[in-house]
Amino acid sequence: GRDHRAKGMLRYVGQHYLQFAETGEWFIKGGADSPENFLGYVEFDGTYRHGKAGGRRRGEAEASKLHRYEPHRRDWRPGDPTWRDGKGRNIIGALNYLASKGMNSVYMLTMNVTGDGKDVWPWTSHDERFRFDCSKLDQWEIVFSHMDRLGLMLHLITQETENDQLLDRGELGIERKLYYRELIARFAHHLAITWNLGEENTNTDAQRKAFARYIHALDPYDHPVVCHTFPGRYDRIYEPLLGYEHFEGPSLQTNDTHRQTLRWVTRSVAAGRKWIVCLDEIGPANTGVKPDADDPAHDEVRT
């Protein structure tokens, strides 16, 4: 079955694929990268849009409102979780739908303050950095636990390019340490997690290494740590991380899928630490992976 609870913790074992601890099954990721503000959901406590969201670009959904996922209400099933007298059915239904289509991972930001969506954060308000919203995080936990049952990895993007200097001006200071500590304390027990240092990340080499080292020091389950960057910046971002003991691989944004995947697989072997190389954003941005009707074999994203 799909339920991760029958498979054990998903671990990095020094190979190019993650492996479930109990069954030994290898994990080949295939999932949803959009919407990145998946947790910007209208029925979570303390969730609102601060300021004006980023402008709507070609191929994007309306940016002015929180997600409702109304078409997926019908995908909720009796016995599935809810909170506060029936809230949460739509987002739970959305996850049911993804699992029914064979997906096994969902990419989502845990903080987009001052970013594109401006509607996801773990604190009591968008301008708070030290007090965490317990009821909201309890509701996230309900969703994440359902993902375990559905066999969906939590690919948690801890920041994005617009806000990667927001906490401690980009350093590993008290704000960032508390943020990482809260995420790990609340959610690291889940069986399949990837911690992503940031979308289109602009921190320094030293900062990225410090973040990864700190996360691994705190996470008792040693979930993999990866990082996403801009196309064209792979060498600048990933080369200094080759062989680094606290980093497990790149989170690629490209339409040159085969060549870049092979390149970083090969380079990681040469550096003595095999990476899991994942393709997490496929260009062009306004289409990504096309619908089955337009590209039935999805050959465009395999080349």
Residue map of PLM features:
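Catalytic-core region of carbohydrate-active enzymes that cleave or remodel glycosidic bonds
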Residues: 220-222, 241-303
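Ligand-binding face of N-terminal immunoglobulin V-set domains in extracellular IgSF glycoproteins
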Residues: 1-3
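Active-site mouth of glycoside hydrolases
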Residues: 9-249, 253-259
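Short microdomains enriched in Cys/His and/or Lys/Arg
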Residues: 6
